[in-house]
Amino acid sequence: KASVGFKAGVKDYRLTYYTPDYETKDTDILAAFRVTPQPGVPAEEAGAAVAAESSTGTWTTVWTDGLTSLDRYKGRCYHIEAVVGEENQYICYVAYPLDLFEEGSVTNMFTSIVGNVFGFKALRALRLEDLRIPPAYSKTFQGPPHGIQVERDKLNKYGRPLLGCTIKPKLGLSAKNYGRAVYECLRGGLDFTKDDENVNSQPFMRWRDRFVFCAEAIYKAQAETGEIKGHYLNATAGTCEEMMKRVTFARELGAPIVMHDYLTGGFTANTTLAHYCRDNGLLLHIHRAMHAVIDRQKNHGMHFRVLAKALRMSGGDHIHAGTVVGKLEGEREMTLGFVDLLRDDFIEKDRRRGIFFTQDWVSMPGVIPVASGGIHVWHMPALTEIFGDDSVLQFGGGTIGHPWGNAPGAVANRVALEACVQARNEGRDLAREGNEIIREAAKWSPELA
């Protein structure tokens, strides 16, 4: 019989994976999980189970454990705190050694950290609240194709938020009518128009026709306004090869920016696309379709700030980030927390804003947050104040729903934005005087009135 110090059988995870005296290393990836254990399961066991199942552990002791150094490779639950105001919920902090992850692969990072552990029997619910990505790991990623400053230089637009608009109705228009709507919005004063996330290549409008008519609209609007314009051409497709074919065609048309649905399209496809965009001078707009499936529940899934960090590593120049005002859910402090994580280089830990770890991006380019979803001109003062200059304010129905049509809707948005930026620069309080500022501007602009 075998007796080489190996004992088969099931033992508590906490004996191996709960290490409250562990000192985290600068190279560790740190995770904050919100854990709801099943009744009767101690918090330490639940936290240790998460650390084990998302790193080296399995449900029983195996003899091949002796062939490697568990101490070097195992995840460790190093701290647990009860969630204030919630019964039987804990924040469990887990540290993962860097060697567990493939360099430059968001796909592998998520497969390890959240791949298997969420179906675990000992847990009633589990949510990944935040990740600390060490510079040693973030430096293995290209990050955004261009970033905020390069985008401003490409567009030659400074000192104000950018304006966008999603073309509506999002499905059903022919390519030519779609291009016409794009032209009217850009001609009226917007910087960008956008394909909706589910506009790919449907029977009523194939992608190539849409790309051609949109390119024509962009060039016509640029010639008439003297400003650089763009339309987010959605290149998301059923296969990566098809996606790259569409992006290549967009580049040949001279389009400045393309778009990708990064959660439905997948991180592997997104990172591939981001590398192509940097190599070929294309900006990359990211839509977060499907995010609420993952981040809506408060006690299970993954917080959007984690998806936002992952996107900054995988690559994208814009990403939708909720609005704080409008039709889609978003709490102000939390939203501002992940907006900073997208844009800034160094973000201090701040639990009030949901930031569990200090994050140092070591000069990785920033991502512009896009505010969209049920917003209109009366929200403009609040949006300008909350999001600041480095943002895209995206109005769909708020432009195209104008009683006079698309171009006047775009004019109204642009006038409102310029009025708010000027008022802010003159030192006025947008939060208090916002409505008054818009009313004053409306005296000079029948479209806004």
Curated annotation (Swiss-Prot):
Gene that specifies this protein: rbcL
Question: Where does the record place it?
Answer: Plastid, Chloroplast
State how it assembles: Heterohexadecamer of 8 large chains and 8 small chains; disulfide-linked. The disulfide link is formed within the large subunit homodimers.
The Gene Ontology biological process annotation of the record reads: photorespiration; reductive pentose-phosphate cycle
What remark does the entry add? The basic functional RuBisCO is composed of a large chain homodimer in a 'head-to-tail' conformation. In form I RuBisCO this homodimer is arranged in a barrel-like tetramer with the small subunits forming a tetrameric 'cap' on each end of the 'barrel'.
Q: Which residues carry this modification: N6,N6,N6-trimethyllysine?
A: K7
Question: What is the name of the protein in this document?
Answer: Ribulose bisphosphate carboxylase large chain
Name the PROSITE patterns for this protein: RUBISCO_LARGE
